[in-house]
């Protein structure tokens, strides 16, 4: 029996976003006061991300007969991430040169007040490659979960799952226990998801109330250029990759519409991570690939953030009248390829990553970030949407490379829209096992 339209989650979230926009615009003070609703929802999701990643990765790896497969899946995922991320950086750079969103501002960097961006610049210091890699290793097993660091949790999960796989039948009872615990946490996800409209309403009301629609006007060309470029990237680059893998990017986007609306409302791709992992399993991807690729992608495969970084750098250069040589632009690309790996799927991380990039590229003044601070929240929504679509496509592609993609199920789900709330994770788990 079909649900009434007003009971469908994505309809509720879309309605909540619209109400949030209206409240924030006409009653900004009240809109700003709604911030705890959005923050509370994101904290609820973050509360269970660690256990879900742990359970999914551990049960997936423990079920592998060949431990070499873990390294093979990880290697293929990182190769894909690097190639597609480089494409995203180049496309952002090219679009900024082609559409020139910063030309005509003629701003003297010395006149800019950098107090507003001081907190971002301070957070960006010290993000070297070595420190980033060392940070992946937690101080203790429990500190990884206490800090909620996705990569640290993933590392612990990899070791734990590999140990269970080596122990084999002797650890079977532990694997079965973790599988049952996983079902409990995914049930919690479904409960939390029911309040997603409230979270989306609060986050959107705060964004519009604090920054106002009027803050968009002076920089509409930059916003339009970024959104247009992101759409082209998704439809052309990711669309081509999807078509080569055997599915339609448009149908895939329609399939994850609920997750996209949650991301749109909260500006955080992390808010949809647990539900996204579940959806990808239902789509036909194996549990082991989903568990490895999705969490890793939240630091290594942020396509929207990559497009934003190179575009923002060129925008600041254009707005301040700085001419960049080819070598300087190649340097920016090289630096961005490293600093982008330190980003995560949370609100504002893209701006911090931009600060880290500019901090090691002295040609362009860090003070120029002031120009886009007011609109970053609106850019964050597009970054997060592009990121989550990119990670979803990456998971399907790696599953196909590993021959662990149920293509019949993939075609059936995308064709008929199966796998929504009526499906259960248990069914997906039985198929993956």
Curated annotation (Swiss-Prot):
Cell compartments where the protein resides: Cell inner membrane
Similarity comment: Belongs to the dicarboxylate/amino acid:cation symporter (DAACS) (TC 2.A.23) family.
InterPro entries recorded: C4_dicarb_transport, Na-dicarboxylate_symporter, Na-dicarboxylate_symporter_CS, Na:dicarbo_symporter_sf
Family matches, as NCBIfam families: PRK01663.1, PRK13027.1
Transmembrane segments: 8-28, 44-64, 78-98, 148-168, 188-208, 222-242, 307-327, 355-375
Protein name: C4-dicarboxylate transport protein
UniProt entry keywords in alphabetical sequence: Cell inner membrane, Cell membrane, Membrane, Symport, Transmembrane, Transmembrane helix, Transport
One GO CC annotation: plasma membrane
Gene Ontology biological process: L-aspartate transmembrane transport
Protein role: Responsible for the transport of dicarboxylates such as succinate, fumarate, and malate from the periplasm across the membrane.
Pfam families: SDF
Protein topology in the membrane: Multi-pass membrane protein
Chief location bin: membrane
UniProt GO molecular function: fumarate transmembrane transporter activity; malate:proton symporter activity; succinate transmembrane transporter activity
């Amino acid at each position: 029996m079909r649900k009434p339209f007003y009971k469908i989650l994505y309809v509720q979230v879309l309605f909540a976003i619209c109400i949030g926009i209206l409240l924030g615009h006409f009653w900004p003070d009240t809109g700003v006061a709604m911030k705890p609703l959005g923050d509370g929802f994101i904290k609820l999701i973050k509360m269970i991300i660690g256990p879900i990643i742990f359970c999914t990765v551990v049960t997936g790896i423990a079920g592998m007969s060949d431990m070499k497969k873990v390294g093979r899946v990880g290697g293929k995922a990182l190769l894909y991430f690097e190639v597609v991320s480089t494409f995203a950086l180049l496309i952002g750079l090219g679009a900024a040169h082609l559409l020139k969103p910063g030309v005509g501002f003629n701003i003297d960097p010395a006149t800019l007040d950098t107090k507003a961006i001081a907190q971002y610049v301070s957070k960006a210091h010290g993000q070297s490659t070595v420190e980033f890699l060392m940070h992946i290793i937690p101080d203790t097993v429990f500190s990884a979960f206490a800090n909620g660091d996705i990569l640290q949790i993933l590392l612990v999960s990899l070791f734990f799952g590999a140990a269970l796989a080596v122990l084999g039948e002797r650890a079977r009872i532990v694997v079965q226990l973790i599988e049952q615990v996983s079902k409990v946490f995914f049930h919690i996800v479904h409960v939390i998801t029911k309040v997603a409209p409230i979270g989306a309403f609060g986050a959107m009301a705060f964004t519009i109330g604090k920054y106002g629609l009027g803050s968009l006007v002076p920089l509409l060309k930059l916003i339009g250029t970024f959104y247009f470029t992101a759409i082209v990237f998704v439809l052309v680059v990711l669309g081509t990759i999807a078509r080569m893998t055997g599915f339609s990017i448009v149908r895939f986007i329609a399939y994850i519409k609920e997750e996209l609306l949650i991301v749109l409302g909260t500006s955080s791709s992390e808010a949809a991570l647990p539900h996204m992992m579940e959806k990808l399993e239902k789509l036909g991807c194996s549990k082991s690939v989903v568990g490895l690729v999705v969490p890793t992608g939240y630091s290594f495969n942020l396509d929207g953030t990559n497009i934003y970084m190179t575009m923002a750098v060129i925008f600041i250069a254009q707005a301040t009248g700085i001419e960049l040589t080819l070598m300087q632009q190649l340097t920016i690309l090289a630096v961005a390829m490293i600093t982008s790996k330190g980003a995560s799927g949370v609100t504002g991380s893209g701006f911090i990553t931009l600060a880290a990039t500019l901090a090691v590229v002295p040609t362009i003044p860090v003070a120029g970030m002031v120009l886009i601070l007011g609109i970053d929240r609106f850019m964050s929504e597009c970054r997060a949407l592009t990121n989550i679509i990119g990670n979803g496509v990456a998971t399907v592609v790696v599953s196909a490379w590993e021959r662990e993609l149920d293509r019949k199920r993939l075609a059936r789900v995308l064709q008929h829209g199966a796998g929504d709330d009526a499906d259960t994770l248990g069914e997906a788990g039985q198929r993956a096992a």
